UniProtKB/Swiss-Prot annotation:
Disulfide bonds join 104-107. It comes from Spinacia oleracea (Spinach). This is Thioredoxin M-type, chloroplastic. Residues 68-180 form the Thioredoxin domain. The record marks 105-106 as: Contributes to redox potential value. Forms a complex with heterodimeric ferredoxin-thioredoxin reductase (FTR) and ferredoxin. InterPro entries: Thioredoxin (IPR005746), Thioredoxin-like_sf (IPR036249), Thioredoxin_CS (IPR017937), Thioredoxin_domain (IPR013766). Gene3D superfamilies: Glutaredoxin. Belongs to the thioredoxin family. Plant M-type subfamily. The active site is at residues 104, 107. Participates in various redox reactions through the reversible oxidation of the active center dithiol to a disulfide. The M form is known to activate NADP-malate dehydrogenase. GO terms for cellular component: chloroplast; cytoplasm.
């Protein structure tokens, strides 16, 4: 997911998408349009044909390639009764699930920590949150008696539970345990 996001062009770098569409009427049917190529975080422009460079030189000058990998996980995704099996039990990577409720003060305290961990371990683990008010069946199935509770799953199997608003290091230690084969 992060790799796909890293290769997308921002709206200011719409040379290959919107900008090309708006200038298609200037090109001959046999003309080639060269768009920026991805080379890390630097932009690189292949040689432009004379028809493209003469029709819109400024368009290429102000465009830029933007890596959106840091935005791949903006927030932890919700999981519910209908998505639980697919996202948690059938996941090919370890899963961390935060059981929470909107009225829970300690849940609000740990939420930013869960968000940070989701960003730090993006692509290595899947991180979800489950609102116990909206999915009480799953909370009951896994004996969730206090919130926040964080459960860890690997290969669809429950491995560990951590109860309460714990320090980030406690969760990090648990994540690291399940990353090794």
């Amino acid at each position: 997911m992060a790799i796909e996001n890293c290769l997308q062009l921002s709206t200011s770098a719409s040379v290959g998408t919107v900008a090309v569409k708006s200038h298609v009427h200037h090109l001959q049917p046999s003309s080639k349009v060269n768009v920026p190529t991805f080379r890390g975080l630097k932009r690189s422009f292949p040689a432009l044909s004379s028809s493209v460079s003469s029709s819109s030189p400024r368009q290429f000058r102000y465009s830029s390639v933007v890596c959106k990998a840091s935005e791949a996980v903006k927030e932890v995704q919700d999981v519910n009764d209908s998505s639980w099996k697919e996202f948690v039990l059938e996941s090919e990577v370890p899963v961390m699930v935060d059981f929470w409720a909107p009225w829970c003060g300690p849940c609000k305290l740990i939420a930013p920590v869960i968000d940070e961990l989701a960003k730090e371990y993006s692509g290595k683990i899947a991180v979800y949150k489950l609102n116990t008010d909206e999915a009480p069946g799953i909370a009951t199935q896994y004996n969730i008696r206090s919130i926040p509770t964080v459960l860890f799953f690997k290969n669809g199997e429950r491995k560990e539970s951590i109860i309460g608003a714990v320090p980030k290091s406690t969760l990090t230690d648990s994540i690291e345990k399940y990353l090794s084969p």
